[in-house]
Amino acid sequence: CADDVIIHQYTGGTTGVSKGAMLTNKNLVANMVQIKTWMVTHLQESKEITLSPLPMYHIFAFTVNCLAMLSYGAHTVLVVNPRDIKSVIKEFKTHKISLMTGLNTLFNALLNHPDFSTVDFSSLKITVGGGMAIQKSVADRWKAITGCPLTEGFGMTESSPLLTVNPLDGSGKQG
């Protein structure tokens, strides 16, 4: 049933004690449909390769990289340790990544690594940041080096997670 709880997703506790959010089938399916509708003009079904440096136990990665992209037929490359910046860069060089999600901290670390500017970003169509505010300076540098806007989204665990996301063309307000 659409209103049945499908998962108890625990919050990060950034605003207090970690809580178990009860997410329903309807929550997750609605978020997947919203994500796919938002990305439809930039991605081709069953042709994309996504880079997922965020852990799947985090609602952002679980919904966007796992559920939405699998339902889109995308191949998802999991990064076991995103703090190992060389391994993230290696995945960019190994696969023609078309979509990446991450946090401002990760994008900044990648931009500051000397090998990052040697990557061919011609296949990168969408980069989405969440989990924290995206700094304008990081977004500007990301666009200058990769040619792809760094799009900021906002959400909460309780909302499965997306509430609002900037336009993919980079025209939205950062931070």
Regions found by a protein language model. Name each.
Residues 29-49, 59-99, 113:
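Conserved AMP-binding/adenylation subdomain of ANL enzymes
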Residues 19-22, 52, 75-81, 151:
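Short beta-strand->loop structural element characteristic of the AMP-binding/adenylate-forming
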Residues 6-33:
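Conserved AMP-binding A3 loop
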Residues 5, 11-14, 50, 56, ...:
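Conserved S/T- and glycine-rich ATP-binding loop of Class I adenylate-forming
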Residues 1-10, 17, 42-49, 159:
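Conserved pre-ATP/AMP-binding loop-to-beta segment of ANL
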Residues 3, 25-26, 54, 95, ...:
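Structural detector for helix-capping/boundary residues
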Residues 53-59, 132:
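Conserved AMP-binding
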Residues 74, 97-102, 111-174:
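Gly/Ser/Thr-rich phosphate-binding loop
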